[in-house]
Amino acid sequence: KPNGAFLSGNYLEYNVMPYGGLLNYGWLDKNLSLAGRILIKKKNTWNSKIIDFQKTVAVVPSVAIHQNDKANSNLDLNMQTDLQPVFFLSEKTSDWIDFLKKELKLTTETIGDYELFLYDNSKPELFGKKDEFLLSPRIDNLTSVCAALESFLESSSENIQVFCSF
């Protein structure tokens, strides 16, 4: 959301919007990173840059069980009040742009606009007695794209074929 930074106490948070099917509780207490596109102006020239922080920069904290006695029986999460990520301690919302500039090592450049996405930056890993299980964020999307692409590549159709993945 444009100008989405806000303060909750001394926490700088950012209004977010869901994309696609969202399993709300799955975002709680995860190490979240930020990636997307940012528009940067340097010497009167605007350039678009793809960015990926590749480290934890935010968390959507859950409430402790003693503060919500219905957490195990009725977890009803509101996108606008319960799922806002916390980025850092701050006293002013303008620190958001300063944060982006510092992380991207920008000095004199101006940040114009951006479209950023939070993602779970946990690393995939195998587990089980014989490492028979794979635990990975985004595995449902990755496997479906892989299966579709393999089918596309192995197809022997003489017709025009198109494969799109977003």
Where are these regions (language model features)?
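N-terminal hydrophobic/helix-forming segments and targeting peptides
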Residues: K1-F166
